[in-house]
Every structure is written in C-alpha cells, then in structure tokens.
C-alpha cells in the first residue's frame, strides 16, 4: 500500500504530534481529543474503526463501552496500539474490511486522505456496504473548501517555515468538500458536514 513507509516513520511520533507537541502540526490537530470524543460519543452499537493508527479513538470507544472492531494497514501503528494500549487492532483498510456482519457505525479519523481521489467513491461504497440499513459513516479528516483555500494555507505555513506540513498538504490526497458532495450525491446518500478547525471537517454519511 502507498504511504506504508510514511506510517513507519510517523508511528513513533504520532501521539506526540496529535497532542500538540509538534509545532508544525499544532493547528491541524487543535481540539484533537474533543473531536475524537465527539466521534466516540456519537457512534453506538457495533462500531468499526478504519485507520485506527495508534488506537487513540479505539481506546475512547472502548472506554465508552462500545462494541468496537478496529483495523489499520500499518504494522508499526498496530504494534503501538496493541502492545502499549492493550488493544486488538487487526490488519485491514478502506478496501479490505475483514468482517462479514454489518456495523451500526463506521468511524475513521485523519486517515481518509490516504485514499486517492479516483478511489474515494469506491471506498465510501465499500464502507456503506458494511453498515446496517440505518447505519452511519463518520469521516473526520483534513478537508478543503477549495483549491484556493488550500493554496492560501500552504503559502501561510511556508512563510512560517513549516515545510513538513506544507509538503504533506501537497502530496497527500486531501478531500475537497464539493468533490465529496458530488460523490455522496452520485451514490444516492445523505451528507452532513461540520467544520471542526482550520483543517478538520466531520462528514456524516447515511443511506
């Protein structure tokens, strides 16, 4: 899978970064714990987490008593989640969901940008097929209202010399709001969007 080498490098630093210790990414993850807590509080019943990473959201879901299954493609991320947080994150990703029984909620946080633009529709379709008829998909991720908004951010953070962040903004497959609306509409689904910080949006998709 693409980005696996990035995951290997990112894994040891991930928790520190999302908790604000890396100045370059601080704005990306403002209110990180609150955003994850909202996902964990909203998701009920049987919950699948895709792109669990080091298990931060998984842990919150379990603490709230949710029946949660979690998957991630990165050996390094899963090792941190399973060995240091006593979780059971299994191998899987957006196109490889190793469970047959449908879920009431599927949640994913800061992972959907690893899906190529031309594959996002199929990824959403795959996830929706793994939901119950009244199930919901929650996607929390960096998204952009327009190309201009994204380029303005890149210019601003280049001026701050946050070059790792701006490289990510130019190389990862971040979703544009209008494109997501088009995908959801073409699939005959419903979409609700709420902005959570300068970068993050929460998309709720239902049948």
Curated annotation (Swiss-Prot):
Keywords recorded for this protein, A-Z: Methyltransferase, S-adenosyl-L-methionine, Transferase
GO biological process: methylation
Domain of life: Bacteria
A Gene Ontology molecular function term of the record: S-adenosylmethionine-dependent methyltransferase activity
Top-level enzyme category: transferase
Ligase keyword on record: no
E.C. no: 2.1.1.-
Matching InterPro entries: Methyltransf_25 (IPR041698), SAM-dependent_MTases_sf (IPR029063), Uncharacterised_MeTfrase_YrrT (IPR023553)
PANTHER family: TRANS-ACONITATE 2-METHYLTRANSFERASE, TRANS-ACONITATE 2-METHYLTRANSFERASE-RELATED
Family: Belongs to the methyltransferase superfamily. YrrT family.
Function: Could be a S-adenosyl-L-methionine-dependent methyltransferase.
Protein name: Uncharacterized methyltransferase Sca_1399
Organism per entry: Staphylococcus carnosus (strain TM300)
């Amino acid at each position: 899978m693409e980005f696996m080498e990035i995951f290997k490098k990112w894994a040891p630093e991930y928790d520190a970064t999302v908790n604000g210790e890396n100045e370059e990414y601080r704005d990306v993850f403002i209110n990180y714990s609150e955003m994850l807590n909202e996902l964990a509080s909203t998701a009920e019943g049987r919950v699948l987490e895709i792109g669990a990473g080091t298990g931060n959201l998984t842990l919150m879901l379990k603490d709230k008593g949710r029946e949660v299954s979690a998957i991630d493609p990165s050996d390094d991320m899963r090792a941190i989640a399973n060995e240091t947080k006593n979780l059971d994150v299994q191998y899987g990703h957006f196109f490889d969901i190793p469970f047959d029984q449908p879920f009431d909620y599927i949640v994913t946080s800061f992972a959907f940008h690893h899906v190529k633009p031309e594959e996002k529709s199929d990824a959403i379709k795959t996830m929706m097929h793994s939901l119950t008829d009244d199930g919901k998909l929650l996607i929390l991720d960096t998204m952009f209202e327009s190309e201009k908004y994204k380029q303005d951010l890149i210019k601003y953070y280049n001026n701050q010399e946050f070059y790792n962040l701006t490289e990510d903004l130019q190389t990862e497959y971040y979703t544009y709001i209008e494109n997501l609306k088009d995908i959801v509409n073409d699939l005959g689904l419903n979409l609700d969007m709420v902005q959570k910080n300068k970068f993050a949006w929460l998309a709720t998709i239902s049948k």
